[in-house]
């Protein structure tokens, strides 16, 4: 091989070496950028992981704090529950005692109630006996009074100069009775009777009631009986002489105090009694006074 060929071969080798060196430089640059990119990515990931770990650590601390708080609350709730259980137990014991006391009280109440019912029955029986005795005494008194007046009238009839009652007045058992021909209110009728030395009739028994019923002549008449009110409620009835009502001859369903102002008593044409407003001017009246000689 001559010198020229060697020169050509050296030139060729030199050209090949230069090309390889250029490619190697290119590879080195690429590798540098790749390493740099990896390094940057690693740093970024490290920063991101650090941030995430810091956030997770903060959240973990918060969660642990909440856990401690929940444990504390759970402990307190457990203590409260235990206290409530104790209170419930005490209340149950108290309820048991109260229930026993109530049962005892109820038994005592039933016993007292039974005794009261027994006493009420005895009292009712006594009242019935007293009522019967009073009714019998009233009948006996009326019979004695009737017999006495009959005897007095018999004695008076023996004296021809004795006139028992004024004209237009009817005699009965020692009293004189005037049956009016006109109508008036109860107060007007009582005033008229007072002017005659009399009063509106007081019916003391069945005999007197029978006498009055025989002379009604199909008309109604005021009696000397009025209601006694207290707080706008009728408490009873009283005659014009102040005596309480012992004998009565009421019509069916009477007295009913219709509309709350039927305070005066009148006798129907049938002889039965009825309550009516004292301002009623549709009825006559009957005056009564003791008989005397003129």
UniProtKB/Swiss-Prot annotation:
Topology with respect to the bilayer: Single-pass type II membrane protein
InterPro entries to which the protein is assigned, alphabetical: C-type_lectin-like, C-type_lectin-like/link_sf, C-type_lectin/snaclec_domain, C-type_lectin_CS, CTDL_fold
Domain C-type lectin, chain residue ranges per copy: 172-287
Disulfide bond annotation, renumbered to this chain: 264-278
Stretches assigned to the Extracellular side: 52-294
Glycosylation sites: 73, 159, 246, 256
Coiled-coil zones: 100-151
UniProt subcellular location: Cell membrane
Gene Ontology annotations for the cellular component aspect, listed alphabetically: plasma membrane
Residue ranges of the TM segments: 31-51
SUPFAM superfamilies, A to Z: C-type lectin-like
Any one biological process term the GO annotation gives: negative regulation of immature T cell proliferation in thymus
Protein name in UniProt: C-type lectin domain family 4 member G
Gene: Clec4g
